Design a protein with these regions (language model features):
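P-loop/Walker-type NTP enzyme "switch/lid" segment
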Residues: 42-117, 213-217, 222
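Conserved beta-strand scaffold positions in the cores of enzyme catalytic domains, especially
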Residues: 5, 86, 201-204
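Conserved catalytic-core segment of NTP-binding enzymes
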Residues: 102-105, 109-113, 118-213
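C-terminal lobe/tail of nucleotide-utilizing enzymes
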Residues: 164-270
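Walker A/P-loop NTP-binding active-site region of P-loop NTPases
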Residues: 5-70
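Flexible glycine-/small-residue-rich
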Residues: 10, 39, 88-91, 123, ...
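Phosphate-binding P-loop
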Residues: 1-3
Length: 270
């Protein structure tokens, strides 16, 4: 994936967008990239909590955009992995404080002058000003979707908005997949989701209780675990870096085997 400024979006809240941003940021850093993750969900800040960094927040995104702090003062370095930094959202301001043009300048500054290889932008749910700001500097997008009808419908709307903004390098992350439910016909399959939305999946994240456990502990799963979701997040980070990583059976169950064949076909027989 050539895009260096990537917005992580969904349309619908509660699909695992923030957890995905944290794990992909940490995964890319683990693989050697210098990564900034930015929380644009002003007023509902939680990327700092998911990453276990809430106790170290001094300045936030709005402080930087309004000139009260320099980017370096607001960026929090994650001590558990080299080269991972968080720029937290403001908890007190509302989304009207966001300025898309200034945000675009900030992301450009991080990539061109602060030496970051990649900036991942955690977009707020919805399509209002928060999304418009988060998408302003983006060259690519990761659309996080759960395999359920309402999530897919919202994702379809977001994909249309991304294309209208001429953000072209867009991929799906299908989150919380349960192969047994798919096999019973109680959940949309990967094939269904891909067919409806017309985007290639770059990550398939299985339902995994370790995601909730690590989030509650303020630990990023990809840095500590070898559970199915941790492996899937790291594989996704590798694909973002351009590696050809086959979709594997992540210790799911035999129902997943058919799914893996579908994915390999989608990715041209890898």
């Amino acid at each position: 994936v050539k895009a260096r400024a990537i917005v992580v979006t969904s349309g619908k809240g509660g699909v695992g967008k923030t957890t995905t941003t944290a794990n992909l940021g940490a995964g890319l850093a683990k693989l050697g990239e210098k990564v900034a993750v930015i929380d644009v969900d002003v007023g509902l800040r939680n990327l700092d909590v998911v990453m276990g960094l809430e106790g170290r927040v001094v300045f936030d995104l709005i402080d930087v955009l309004e000139g009260r702090a320099k980017p370096r003062q607001a960026l929090i370095r994650d001590k558990r992995v080299e080269n991972l930094y968080l720029l937290p959202a403001s908890q007190t301001k509302d989304k009207e404080a966001l300025d898309p043009a200034r945000f675009q300048d900030l992301v450009r500054h991080l990539l061109e002058e602060e030496g970051f290889d990649r900036v991942l932008i955690d977009s707020p749910a919805g399509i209002e000003k928060g999304f418009q700001t988060a998408a302003a500097p983006a060259e690519g997008a990761l659309v996080v979707v759960n395999p359920e009808v309402s999530s897919v419908r919202d994702a379809d709307r977001i994909i249309g908005l991304l294309e209208a903004r001429e953000i072209r390098e867009n991929f799906l992350i299908i989150n919380r997949l349960r192969p047994r439910m798919v096999a019973r016909g109680d959940m949309l399959s990967v094939e269904d989701v891909v067919e409806i939305l017309g985007l290639k999946p770059i990550g398939i994240i299985p339902e995994d209780e370790q995601v909730l456990v690590s989030t509650n502990q303020g630990e990023v799963l990809v840095l500590k675990g070898t559970s199915p979701a941790a492996v899937a997040y790291l594989d996704t980070a590798r694909r973002l870096r351009g590696e050809e990583v086959p979709f594997r059976n992540l210790g799911l169950d035999s129902d997943a085997q058919g799914l893996l064949g579908v994915l390999r076909r989608l990715f041209g027989g890898r």
